[in-house]
Amino acid sequence: MMMMSSLGGGGGGGGGSGGGIGGGGGGRFMTYSSSLSVPPSAPQSPNYSGGLRSQSSVFVEQEKYLSELLAERHKLTPFLPVLPHAFRLLNQEILRVTTLLENATVLSQSGLDHPSPLASGGIFQNARADMNGWASQFPSERSVPSSPGPNWLNSPGSSSGLIAKRTIRVDIPVDNYPNFNFVGRLLGPRGNSLKRVEASTDCRVLIRGRGSIKDPIKEEMMRGKPGYEHLNEPLHILVEAELPIEIVDARLMQAREILDDLLTPMEETHDMYKKQQLRELALLNGTLREEGSPMSGSVSPYNSLGMKRAKTREG
């Protein structure tokens, strides 16, 4: 259902944000480079002395740099009409860094080269700080445009200047799969999976309805309060876009396609996407053990993390 106004509760009512497939061009998946480098302008680690740093250290540093880029983009957004080239260059740098981050979580695992539904241009976007009960170290920000293909960001003169604000609803099939943790799969480690959906589509993604707050007791307390009317509805997703009228519908449909993929349950033994999420969590926590590493402990992060599901989010 397409609407011309934003839906969902106000305030800190709880949508997590995220990012995914890049827009424009050909297929939905892209080939990765396995390199992970620190951008020249990224802050350097205080204990960096020219030697090689651990992968987790570089990963955290990249995330910090990306968070700063996202904050700058948020401040620059009102000036898009007068600074289109600066805006485009900033988005290209965001794309470059986020692609490196996605590459690190996907290809550095020995023998794993299975693109996830979010693999094409996999982008880390900023999430709302609370993530409805999910831990997040990123500030609350708006979405990030997708890859620098032939779209409105690269063609400032191609837009009519008309901005449309629209929202679609995607139902989550909890009745068909009552034991499947859809919210955990959508959010991913520290909300990164959902950040990528937002980042690649330039849409805002909100998880709403019963079960969208991590703490059931808190959900009951918030039910019926202003801004939390959605808690009386079945679990669902709202996808909001405020974009040039020429691309808004395409971006919404792109986001819906990604979410439909993520909402399709799979057998755990064949779920490469979940394995990527588990490995990413281990990398973020500094507990990753690469195959052949002299360090003690489990070789596979999937066997040692005990992360089954990321449950629901808090308002």
From Swiss-Prot:
It is found in: Nucleus. Keywords: Nucleus, Phosphoprotein, RNA-binding. Residues 7-28 have a biased composition (Gly residues). GO terms for molecular function: RNA binding. Residues 171-238 form the KH domain. The keyword Phosphoprotein applies. One of its GO terms (cellular component) is nucleus. Residues 31-53, 136-146 have a biased composition (Polar residues). The modification Phosphoserine is found at S300. Its main location: nucleus. InterPro entries: BBP-like, KH_1_KHDC4/BBP-like, KH_dom, KH_dom_type_1_sf, STAR_dimer. Residues 1-53, 136-158, 289-315 are annotated as: Disordered. This is KH domain-containing protein At5g56140. It comes from Arabidopsis thaliana.
